[in-house]
C-alpha cells in the first residue's frame, strides 16, 4: 500500500509539473481564422475537410461563411454556414478515433460555436457604416484577444468584404493610435483578391501584414502560386482514384469530400483545394515561416513588394511560381492520407 501511495504521489507530482508545460504548448499553436466562400465551387468543402484533419495543430478561432462563390458565380448573394456545420458534424463522428493518435483536438461543439455568418453581398459598396455583420464583429473580438507576438492568422479563402468591414470599423472608431495598436495583432493570407478590393484596402488600411497570393498583372490567373496545390508537379496525386482510396474510404469526414471541381487544365477534375495553401502557410509542419514569407513551404514562397505587401514570385528563368507549392505535393498528400486513416476505428 505504501508503494502504491508513493507511486500515486509521484504521478500527481509529475502531472503538476507538466501541466504548465502542456498549457504552454497548446498556447503556442497558431491562432487561425478562416473566411470561406463555401457554397460555390466545392473546393472549399475539400479545403475545410483537410483543415479539420489538422484541427489539433491550430487554435481555430473563427470559421466565417462569407458571400458564397466568386463574383458573378451565383445568381444571388447568399451565405452557406450550414455547409460548415455539416462538415463539423462529420468530424464529430470520427473525433474519438482521431483522439487515439494525437492530442489537442477541438470538440465539435466548440467548432460550431465559432461558425459565424458574414455579408451575403460583397465589394466596396457593402463596406462602411451600417454594414457590420456577426462575422466582422467576431473578427474584431478575436483580433483584440491577441498581441503582436500572438497574431491572429487570417486565411481568406473567398471575398474580403467582412474582413474589410472589421478593419473599417476599427479605424473609424478607434482613431490612428487605436488602429496602429490593432494592426499589429493579425496577419493575412488572401487567396486571389476575390472581391476586387485589395488596392482600396492597401490604401485605406496602412500597415497590415498582408500576403496576396495572386498571379501578377498580365499573367494567366491560373499561374498563381497557390494553384500549385492542384497544378504542375505530379497531378496523379489529385486524381479521383487517389481520393477514393485515401480520403473517401476513411469514414464520415472523408465521405463528404467532393470529387468534382473546376481544375482546368488539370485533367482529373477532382482535387482542387485552391484555398488550402492559405492555412498550409501557418501550419507548423508545413515548413513556412509566417514571419518571413520568402522562405519556402507548403503554402508557397513569396516576395515583398515596395508597398509592404507580399506577393507571388515572378515567372522567369524557367521558374513556375506554382512549383513552390506543387513540389511538396507528395509530402502533403502522404500526410493527409495518414491523418485521414486516423479516422478509422482500427487505424494504428
Tell what function each PLM region has.
Residues 7-20:
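Bacterial N-terminal signal peptides
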Residues 24-348:
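N-terminal acidic, glycine/proline-rich low-complexity segments
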Residues 1-5:
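N-terminal secretory signal peptides that target proteins for export/translocation
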Amino acid at each position: 500500500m505504501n508503494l502504491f501511495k508513493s507511486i500515486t504521489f509521484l504521478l500527481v507530482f509529475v502531472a503538476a509539473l507538466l501541466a504548465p508545460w502542456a498549457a504552454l504548448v497548446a498556447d503556442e499553436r497558431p491562432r487561425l481564422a478562416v473566411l470561406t466562400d463555401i457554397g460555390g465551387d466545392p473546393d472549399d468543402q475539400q479545403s475545410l475537410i483537410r483543415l479539420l484533419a489538422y484541427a489539433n495543430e491550430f487554435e481555430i478561432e473563427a470559421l466565417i461563411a462569407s458571400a458564397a462563390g466568386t463574383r458573378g458565380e451565383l445568381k444571388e448573394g447568399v451565405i452557406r454556414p450550414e455547409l460548415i456545420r455539416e462538415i463539423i458534424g462529420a468530424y464529430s463522428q470520427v473525433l474519438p478515433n482521431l483522439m487515439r493518435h494525437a492530442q489537442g483536438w477541438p470538440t465539435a461543439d466548440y467548432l460550431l460555436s465559432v461558425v459565424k455568418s458574414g455579408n451575403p453581398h460583397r465589394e466596396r459598396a457593402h463596406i462602411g457604416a451600417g454594414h457590420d455583420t456577426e462575422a466582422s464583429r467576431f473578427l474584431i473580438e478575436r483580433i483584440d484577444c491577441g498581441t503582436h507576438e500572438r497574431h491572429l492568422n487570417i486565411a481568406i479563402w473567398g471575398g474580403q468584404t467582412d474582413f474589410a468591414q472589421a478593419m473599417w470599423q476599427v479605424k473609424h472608431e478607434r482613431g490612428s493610435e487605436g488602429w496602429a495598436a490593432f494592426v499589429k495583432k493579425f496577419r493575412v493570407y488572401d487567396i486571389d483578391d476575390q472581391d476586387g478590393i485589395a488596392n482600396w484596402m492597401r490604401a485605406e488600411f496602412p500597415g497590415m501584414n498582408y500576403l496576396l497570393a495572386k498571379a501578377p498583372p498580365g499573367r494567366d490567373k491560373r499561374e498563381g502560386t497557390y494553384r500549385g496545390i492542384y497544378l504542375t508537379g505530379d497531378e496523379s496525386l489529385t486524381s479521383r482514384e487517389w481520393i477514393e482510396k485515401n480520403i473517401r474510404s476513411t469514414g464520415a469526414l472523408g465521405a463528404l469530400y467532393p470529387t468534382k471541381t473546376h481544375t482546368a487544365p488539370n485533367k482529373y477534375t477532382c482535387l482542387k483545394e485552391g484555398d488550402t495553401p492559405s492555412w498550409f502557410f501557418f501550419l507548423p509542419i508545413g515548413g513556412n515561416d509566417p514571419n518571413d514569407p520568402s522562405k519556402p513551404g507548403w503554402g508557397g514562397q513569396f516576395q515583398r513588394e515596395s508597398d509592404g505587401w507580399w506577393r507571388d514570385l515572378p515567372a522567369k528563368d524557367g521558374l513556375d511560381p506554382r512549383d513552390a507549392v506543387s513540389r511538396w505535393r507528395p509530402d502533403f498528400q502522404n500526410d493527409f492520407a495518414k491523418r485521414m486513416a486516423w479516422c478509422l476505428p482500427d487505424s494504428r
